[in-house]
Amino acid sequence: MREIVHLQTGQCGNQIGAKFWEVVSDEHGIERDGLYKGNNDLQLERISVYYNEIGASKYVPRAVLVDLEPGTMDSVRSGPLGSLFRPDNFVFGQSGAGNNWAKGHYTEGAELVDSVLDVVRKEAEGCDCLQGFQITHSLGGGTGAGMGTLLISKIREEYPDRMMCTYSVVPSPKVSDTVVEPYNATLSVHQLVENSDETFCIDNEALYDICFRTLKLSTPTYGDLNHLVSIVMSGITTCLRFPGQLNSDLRKLAVNMVPFPRLHFFMTGFAPLTARGSAQYRAVTVPELTQQMFDAKNMMAASDPRHGRYLTVAAVFRGKVSMKEVEEQMQNVQNKNSAYFVEWIPNNVLTAQCDIPPRGLKMAVTFLGNSTAIQELFKRVSDQFTAMFKRKAFLHWYTQEGMDEMEFTEAESNMQDLVAEYQQYQDATVEEEGEYEDEVLEDEQ
């Protein structure tokens, strides 16, 4: 089967990753000790996508857990899923990266990277037909951002034809953990533009908003935020793990979603999002799902899709839904909001379907949008970067790890190019293409 090897790096990556394995194990009926206790053959049919079977109905996640300090790993190990993972797959250093991208990418992380790659190789060799890798990390810190991107480029070298898919937590405008986030994030995006096939952008602030507004939580914890992320991760891969009428895998997703290789940063969303207690009081319909999923308040990245246009969209419906109704509703959204979809990619909405809904819901949908509005997010980080960089603030932390200012300048201009590319395609219309063709014809005559 088409296996995916999962990596989680840094504190953020490990916390999201742990939550993801909770959700997936629950969906597949895997207990905390790795034993299968489910009640449905469909749970086992494609379980090998994420799990290795090592004995009579005992399953171990194809997961590699990486960090430069032991703290987060210890809490995963002593947490509810501690005994699920292979003990050899915990790879950690002792020194930490101290929120310094250069430490993660060039010094501390580079020392640990070979032992991580050994584990990755081992996992990849245990696969029948490896489809690709997914990595959870944040872009604002040292380990997830610096070492995460180092791992991505190393894996890219070794497995150039496999999909590389990242779930990246981008620094949010108001909630900041460290002052050097803009540096770390810009250096990371510089890497992701070149080395990732699909990057799902997630942002803590947008997640907080969803918790306050929609889920009515007065004091959301990181656990609540990570739960939202894990639902989306589970939704994106649901087609690989369960049967459905319209299945999609990482590569099909990329082919449909990425019109230009550099523009592979997606917004994600999920519907129905209802407050924990009120879910059982109402039935959800396909029109409601469709409407909620395109709602700006549902986006898990802090950029407003109404400020840009969608290049492409993918929707993964789960549960017993009528595909005819889904197609009608999706068409309906496009017709009513045609200004928000670029007209030079006809049929730019992909729909996939899977029969098994998430726990506790009759039907649900996961949304992926490649919208030019994501440039707002990059622009914001880029402006903060420039403000600090022109004063060379905090630079010594990076240069003393052996980095060159040149690399900062390159990362800065790459980020600005990315913003400009999104803007260019946001403004592009079919007419421009037409005018150009007329000129060519005149020249030929």
UniProtKB/Swiss-Prot annotation:
Biological process annotations from GO: microtubule-based process
One cellular component term from this protein's GO annotations in UniProt: microtubule
Keyword entries, A-Z: Cytoplasm, Cytoskeleton, GTP-binding, Magnesium, Metal-binding, Microtubule, Nucleotide-binding
Binding sites annotated in the UniProt record for Mg(2+): 69
Bilayer-spanning residue ranges: none
The keyword Metal-binding appears for this protein: yes
Cofactor: Mg(2+)
Similarity field: Belongs to the tubulin family.
Subunit annotation: Dimer of alpha and beta chains. A typical microtubule is a hollow water-filled tube with an outer diameter of 25 nm and an inner diameter of 15 nM. Alpha-beta heterodimers associate head-to-tail to form protofilaments running lengthwise along the microtubule wall with the beta-tubulin subunit facing the microtubule plus end conferring a structural polarity. Microtubules usually have 13 protofilaments but different protofilament numbers can be found in some organisms and specialized cells.
Name of protein: Tubulin beta chain
Species in which this protein is naturally found: Coprinopsis cinerea (strain Okayama-7 / 130 / ATCC MYA-4618 / FGSC 9003) (Inky cap fungus)
Taxonomic placement: Eukaryota, Fungi, Dikarya, Basidiomycota, Agaricomycotina
